[in-house]
A protein has these predicted regions:
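A structural signal for short loop-to-beta-strand junctions that line the ligand-binding cleft
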Residues: 107-108, 116, 144-182, 215, ...
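C-terminal lobe and pocket-closing loops
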Residues: 304-315, 331-337, 341-442
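Extracytoplasmic/periplasmic solute-binding protein
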Residues: 161-169, 174, 198-251, 295
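Hinge/lid segment of periplasmic solute-binding proteins
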Residues: 51, 122-175, 203, 229, ...
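Short helix-initiation/N-cap motifs at beta->coil->alpha
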Residues: 96-105, 195-202, 278-291
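Short, solvent-exposed loop/beta-turn-alpha elements that line the ligand-binding surface or hinge
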Residues: 54, 108, 135-150, 193, ...
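Glycine-centered hinge/linker elements that transmit conformational signals in sensory
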Residues: 204, 247-279, 321, 325
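Conserved N-terminal structural module of periplasmic/extracytoplasmic solute-binding proteins
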Residues: 4-10, 18-133, 141-148, 190, ...
Length: 481
């Protein structure tokens, strides 16, 4: 899914100490600055003793590689591998198509089968660090000449207690992606970008045709993504997931704001009849329904639904609009969960492997080589009748010199999707909770499924029970230092 012009000087520092978090938090490793084993990844020092520079240690790293159906992304990654190997011939590359899974990461780490670096999300930072499954890359980060030009909002998600554990690729604020053609076909007005819950409800109800299998909106109803989708509305109503105070983490999502968000879901299902009849959809299924024209709206980071709608569903850019999340009421904030893609280095990797992984991850950052590769990719897509969908937020500041260079390339091609500036201006990202976010999502998914399946469900009772469960099973077990 993702070179730094000064990395050559990093090679002169290949003997540097690389910090990595060990299993169970790795406190000793953090104190000593060691990742276990030799602090000199090159090992043999005889070359230096003879006045000759050491040859870099030959290493093999397994990299996070796009899935088989992501043909354009694979083509871009293959080009990066070729260029990286030209500069770093001592690094062998193995492609891994394992993508991060909460259910699988523990098994992968225990069996030493996780790739040298892997993708993950903002919610996982605390979890991975506490489990000892993310290498402490602070020393590598501090040596990186462009660290101060990395988007701070994204970078800060993986900086914990002053230590760095992940590298951002791109980010998003959860949005609503809308099929304008479905609305036009039914004569339903397209709402303003500065819209509200009632505007969304009214639009979803008006465009839905249950008898034809067309929904007005498809809130996710299966997997942790169901709880994630709903949390956007919790935030918009002024609520939060947890409160951290006086050394304790307390569940607070069973608030008045939480009840309002649950009532909205109940209205979408039972009053408006605007959600899919087969509402138990995970991310892929909901986004797939959108790209196939079976729902007018879907809630997600915009890049994925846009890519599927344009490149698989055959939709035209003018018919696929990206909206901020609706405000609870007129004049309110359009808050969406802040998310994105981060890459984490495996703490089981050797120092030399961790260094090579860091070099690979950052290889194209802030470089003219990447700009050339990006333009070639856009041109190749254009020749195939495909579209390029930029991320909402990149690892760099869009207003920086480099950001302006990227935008100049985008402006040259009509097959690059253009986000509406007014919609982008209204985006208001809120980071996910610090602790046990995925567990909270899973519990809320059960509540949402009850709301969608039982018309007479006691919303307050279910919300209170969910908060009590999350508190007892997860938050009460947190020991804060």
């Amino acid at each position: 899914m993702r070179k730094w012009i000064a990395l050559a000087c990093c090679l002169a520092l290949i003997g540097m100490t690389i910090v990595a978090c060990g299993g169970g938090g790795g406190k000793a490793d953090r104190q000593t600055g060691q990742a276990g084993g030799s602090a000199s990844p090159g090992g043999n020092t005889s070359g230096a003793a003879n006045g000759q520079p050491d040859e870099p240690e030959e290493v093999t790293i397994s990299i996070y590689y796009p899935l088989p159906d992501q043909t354009e992304a694979r083509r871009l990654e293959d080009d990066k591998i070729r260029r990286f190997r030209e500069k770093y011939p001592h690094v062998n590359i193995v492609k891994s198509d394992w993508h991060y899974s909460v259910e699988e990461i523990g098994l992968k780490m225990a069996a030493n089968e996780a790739p040298t670096f892997f993708n993950t999300w903002a919610t996982e930072a605390k979890f991975l660090v506490e489990k000892g499954w993310a290498a402490d890359i602070t020393e590598l980060w501090n040596q990186y000449p462009y660290k101060d030009q990395i988007n701070p909002i994204l970078a800060n998600q993986f900086i914990i207690d002053g230590r760095v554990y992940g590298i951002p690729q791109k980010g998003y604020t959860t949005s609503v992606v809308l099929n304008k053609k479905l609305l036009d076909d039914k004569g339903v007005p397209v709402p303003d970008y500065d819209w509200t819950w009632e505007d969304m409800l009214r639009t979803a109800r008006a465009v839905a045709e249950p008898e034809k299998g067309i929904a007005g909106i498809a809130p996710m109803g299966k997997g942790n993504e169901a709880g994630w989708n709903w949390t956007n509305f919790l935030f918009e109503a002024g609520g939060d997931i947890q409160e951290v105070k006086d050394g304790k983490v307390t569940a607070v999502f069973n608030s008045e704001a939480g009840l309002k968000a649950l009532e909205l879901y109940h209205r979408l299902r039972w009053e408006a009849n605007a959600i899919p009849q087969d509402w138990a959809l995970n991310w892929g299924e909901a986004v797939g329904a959108f790209s196939q024209g079976r729902t007018a709206m879907v809630i997600a980071g915009a890049e994925g639904p846009l890519d599927q709608a344009l490149n698989q569903g055959g939709m035209l850019p003018e018919n696929v609009l990206t909206f901020p999340m609706p405000a609870y009421e007129k004049g309110g904030r359009h808050i969406g969960v802040l998310g994105g893609d981060w890459l984490v280095i495996n703490p089981n990797a050797t120092p030399a492997e961790q260094k090579a992984a860091f070099d690979y991850i950052t290889f194209d950052y802030f470089t003219d080589d990447y700009l050339e590769s990006l333009e070639r990719d856009i041109q190749a897509r254009q020749a195939e009748g495909k579209y390029f969908v930029p991320p909402q937020f990149n690892y760099f500041d869009s207003n920086s010199e480099y950001g302006r260079k990227v935008q100049a390339i985008f402006d040259k091609y009509d097959n690059v999707y253009k986000y509406d500036p007014e919609s982008t201006r209204l985006l208001d990202g809120k980071p996910e909770a610090q602790y046990h976010t995925q567990d909270y999502y899973a519990v809320m998914t059960n509540v949402i499924q009850k709301v969608f399946s039982e018309k007479d469900v006691d919303l307050k009772k279910e919300l209170d029970a969910a908060a009590a469960l999350v508190q007892a099973d997860y938050f009460d077990k947190i020991v804060l230092e």
